[in-house]
Design a protein with these regions (language model features):
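Phosphate-group recognition and catalysis centered on beta-loop-alpha active-site segments
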Residues: 1-155
Length: 155
């Protein structure tokens, strides 16, 4: 019998601000096999981890991810909405999130591609290949056809 995999949706989002590095760390600390994260593209074509198109619910400003630059997003507090102990938690880049997961042996990653763009095959593998160790599993529940192109093969 196969043991089910536990994938923490947006990290340990009950315990920490969703889709943040602290949420991904906590998910692994409590025993998850992997994390699911939402990827969006910023105004200046950077890839960040955030579920909603708008930042309104998680910051003190109103705006859409794709209308804001990486610098503008990195200046925002994405943690205080959850609890004061998470004040100044910043939005994570895809690169930062993948590097964190690569440092936690055996961590599986599922990417949910949220932005209204369709360049997944060229953006996803490049970032993943730079930060993931050989054989690291990755998938995209919303775009299963991209999964083979995103997984890094052992050499």
């Amino acid at each position: 019998m196969t043991t089910p995999q536990i994938i923490a949706h947006r990290g340990a989002s009950y315990l920490a601000p969703e889709n943040t590095l602290v949420a991904f760390r906590k998910a692994m600390e409590i025993g998850a096999d992997g994390v699911e994260m939402d990827v969006q593209k910023t105004y200046d074509n950077e890839l960040v981890i955030h579920h909603d198109y708008m930042v309104d619910m998680h910051t003190d400003i109103s705006g859409q991810i794709y209308d804001l630059t990486m610098g503008e997003l990195k200046a925002l507090d994405f943690g205080s909405w959850k609890d004061a102990i998470y004040a100044n938690e910043r939005i994570a880049t895809l690169q930062e999130a993948l590097e964190l997961c690569a440092g936690m042996e055996g961590t599986q990653v599922q990417l949910e591609l949220k932005s209204p763009w369709r360049t997944t095959p060229t953006l996803c593998p490049g970032c993943w290949m730079r930060s993931a160790p050989p054989g690291s599993p990755i998938g995209s529940p919303s775009s299963p056809s991209t999964t083979p192109s995103c997984g890094r093969q052992s050499s």
